Design a protein with these regions (language model features):
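Short glycine/serine/threonine-rich phosphate/pyrophosphate-binding segments
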Residues: 19-29, 51, 85-86, 100-116, ...
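Short, acidic/small-residue loops that bind anionic groups at enzyme active sites
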Residues: 41, 119-144, 196-200, 253
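Flexible, glycine/charged-enriched surface loops at secondary-structure junctions
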Residues: 38-44, 162-169, 221-225, 248-254, ...
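N-terminal phosphate-binding or glycine-rich loops at protein starts, especially the Walker A/P-loop
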Residues: 2-51
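Phosphate-binding loop/pocket of nucleotide- and phosphate-handling active sites
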Residues: 245, 289-324
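Accessory alpha-helical/coil subdomains and C-terminal extensions
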Residues: 105-107, 113, 117, 124, ...
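Glycine-rich oxoanion-binding loops at beta->alpha junctions
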Residues: 2-3, 50-103, 110-111, 143-150, ...
Length: 324
């Protein structure tokens, strides 16, 4: 059995937007902790639930038959109160009240920012990256991205079928307010004619319209445009393109469809290993870390350093997308 460094009780919560694979991570945290003699307290509805003391003790039975389920069994929510010093102090006090000596937070940058604030009040926090946006800079992988990308890819394949039949231009809006990884990967996987990303800081709509008109003259009959939600309104974009080109254009917003569904093998396995890694870090006495994956290895970063990192889409991926 691992040396516990006087740790006997840990907590786990999911925060922010849900992502497929979160249950696999929760399951791994609980099972690894129990295997090492720790007590696990699950916190429902993220920081919102923490501030309301929605805290339960978890057993192996609580995570049985959950690895294949989408969403999060602990549920999730966003909390404005947690953004305030008063809320952060209250949250830390509640954790101490329940004897929680270390907290595992599964979520994105916003969730990690909340965790970092808790560390200022003496709470040991360990972050696990869970977001379909793939926008956490310290890791090449985030829980949920693979499932969301596959869900979107399958939907776009179906949209192309009907777009081809009706000789239409189809705009498909995928999630990604500030990050375009989902749009880029789906654009490459689906052979989209155009991919619009927030990282491009705007796009030349007139050039795209001119290109559609020119390709129409050469005999091309259908088009797929992948639009990340942070770029602009897909419905009005469709109206403008149809008016300018004469090509019937429809917009489809995939929305929260991308967050649901049974996680892929990759999301289940990576989430499971990250969950186990988080508990191992606690048992090793490490504090205030974020679990990550880089170059084939599971690693960890100081949470303060992780939050300072910026993630940019590699130029070669953008270049490949233009060619393909």
């Amino acid at each position: 059995m691992t040396d516990h460094y006087e740790i006997n009780t840990i907590g786990v919560l999911t925060s922010g937007g849900d992502a497929p694979g979160m249950n696999a991570a929760i399951r791994a945290v609980v099972r690894t902790a129990l295997a090492n003699g720790l007590t696990v307290r699950g916190i429902r509805r993220g920081y919102h639930g923490l501030l309301r003391e929605e805290i339960i003790e978890m057993s192996g039975r609580d995570v049985a038959d959950t690895i294949q389920r989408g969403g999060t069994i602990l549920q999730t929510a966003r909390s404005q109160q947690m953004r305030t010093p008063e809320g952060q102090l209250k949250a830390a006090s509640i954790l101490k009240k329940y004897g929680i000596q270390a907290l595992v937070v599964i979520g994105g940058d916003g969730s990690f920012a909340g965790a970092q604030k808790l560390s200022d009040y003496g709470i040991n926090v360990i972050g696990i990256p869970g977001t379909i946006d793939l926008d956490i800079a310290c890791t090449e992988y985030t829980i949920g991205f693979d499932t969301a990308a596959n869900t979107a890819m399958e939907a776009i394949d179906k949209i192309r079928d009907t777009s081809t039949s009706h000789e239409r231009c189809s705009i498909v809006e995928v999630m990604g307010r500030d990050a375009g990884y989902l749009a880029l990967w789906c654009g490459i996987a689906n052979g989209a004619e155009y991919i619009l990303l927030p990282e491009q800081h705007g796009y030349d709509e007139q050039a795209m319209i001119n290109d559609i008109i020119e390709k129409r003259k050469r005999g091309k009959k259908h088009y797929i445009i992948i639009n990340a939600e942070g770029v602009g309104d897909s419905i009005n974009m469709a109206k403008r393109i149809e008016e300018a080109t004469g090509v019937e254009t429809r917009a489809t917003i995939l929305g929260h469809l991308q967050r649901g569904g049974s996680p892929t093998v990759k999301d289940r396995v990576y989430a499971s290993i990250m969950g186990a890694k988080a508990v191992e870090l606690i048992l090793e006495g490490k504090t205030n870390r974020v679990v990550g994956y880089q170059d084939g290895h599971y690693i960890d970063f100081d949470i303060n350093d992780a939050l300072k990192m910026n993630k940019e889409i590699p130029e070669y991926q953008l270049d490949i997308a233009k060619i393909l």
